[in-house]
């Protein structure tokens, strides 16, 4: 993990760069009980049938993946609009799911298959259970030491509250509040860092409530159990829409950080194939079109960098 700056608690905005820090996927704080699971309503997936196979890229695909014919993706499917379950509760949908299918199409494979996996378990399963991890992974130096990361999105972070802000949450001073986050995300570590700053300043600590699924947070936030939630800006916007306006963003979006596709560190061949397939999707407008289906096209990057330098 790269060195993080210790921030003053006068303004949250000044601490935004902490969100590039990787959360320790083995650590949780005050785990929340997730007894109610909400499922986002069905969305129209992007039709990948018009995306061609690119022979030069298909030639790079490792033989075992070619033989299988499937690009296996692990994703924590409770983080709409990136990855979540359809109304049937069984079918993964979202822009990351469509991106995996599009990559498979470019690489000449039969399909891209996504299976749900709890967020902290995805990276350890790369190279065995999964070929790729496309699940809103913020690119960090720690993750780049563990796996190869191919950049494709730039996503900020934002606070969300019940509409009207009935708890009077102040994003510039969240001390003494109860904040919901998804387990293993950059936002979980950021909230814990803010809590430490609060205590150091003689203020009340932040009670951080991690959930395995981001979708579990909405009901409890609306019901008044939490003061606020902290998540990717795309997630807050989508959650607001899906809640019928019962959740809203408060404050500005924090500084954006790149997200990447994770591939096993020792699989240079698959890494090259994924990087070039992603660049093809970018160059030909497919990535933007996929994201636009979910209202997230502003997050698209134009260069698929391998293990980019991050602060």
What are these regions (language model features)?
Residues 18-21:
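C-terminal motif of bacterial Sec signal peptides marking the signal peptidase cleavage site
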Residues 23-26:
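Bacterial signal peptide processing site
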Residues 40-133:
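Extracytoplasmic small-molecule ligand-binding "clamshell" domains
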Residues 44-63, 189-208, 279-311:
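Ligand-binding clefts/hinges and TM-proximal coupling segments of bilobed small-molecule sensing domains
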Residues 77, 153-161, 237, 241-279, ...:
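Periplasmic-binding protein-like
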Residues 92-106, 137-139, 156-213, 228, ...:
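Bilobed "Venus flytrap"/periplasmic-binding protein-like clamshell domains
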Residues 112-173:
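Acidic, polar ligand-binding/catalytic clefts
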Residues 137-144, 192-193, 223-256:
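A ligand-binding cleft/hinge motif common to bilobed small-molecule-binding domains
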């Amino acid at each position: 993990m790269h060195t993080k700056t210790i921030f003053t608690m006068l303004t949250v905005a000044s601490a935004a760069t902490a969100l590039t820090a990787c959360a320790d996927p083995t650590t949780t704080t005050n785990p929340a009980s997730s007894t109610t699971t909400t499922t986002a309503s069905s969305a129209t997936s992007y039709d990948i049938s018009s995306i061609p196979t690119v022979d030069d890229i298909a030639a790079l695909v490792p033989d075992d993946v070619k033989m299988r014919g499937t690009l296996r993706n692990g994703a924590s499917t409770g983080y709409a609009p990136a990855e979540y379950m359809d109304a049937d509760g069984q079918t993964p949908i979202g822009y990351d799911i469509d991106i995996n299918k599009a990559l498979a199409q470019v690489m000449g494979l039969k399909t891209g298959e996504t299976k749900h996996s709890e967020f902290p378990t995805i990276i350890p399963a790369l190279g065995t259970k999964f070929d790729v991890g496309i699940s809103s992974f913020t690119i960090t130096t720690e993750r780049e030491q563990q796996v190869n990361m191919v950049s494709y999105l730039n996503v900020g972070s934002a606070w969300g509250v019940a509409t009207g802000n009935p708890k009077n949450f102040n994003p510039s001073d969240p001390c003494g509040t109860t904040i919901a986050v998804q387990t293993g995300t950059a936002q979980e570590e950021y909230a814990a860092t803010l809590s430490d700053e609060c205590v150091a300043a003689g203020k009340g600590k932040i009670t951080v409530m991690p959930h395995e699924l981001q979708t579990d947070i909405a009901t409890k936030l609306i019901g008044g159990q939490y003061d606020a939630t902290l998540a990717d800006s795309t997630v807050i916007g989508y959650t607001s829409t899906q809640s019928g306006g019962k959740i809203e963003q408060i404050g500005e979006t924090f500084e954006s950080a790149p997200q990447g596709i994770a591939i096993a560190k020792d699989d240079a061949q698959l890494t090259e194939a994924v990087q070039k397939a992603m660049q093809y999707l970018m160059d030909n407008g497919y990535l933007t079109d996929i994201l636009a289906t979910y209202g997230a096209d502003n997050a698209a990057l134009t260069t698929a960098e391998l293990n980019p330098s991050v602060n």
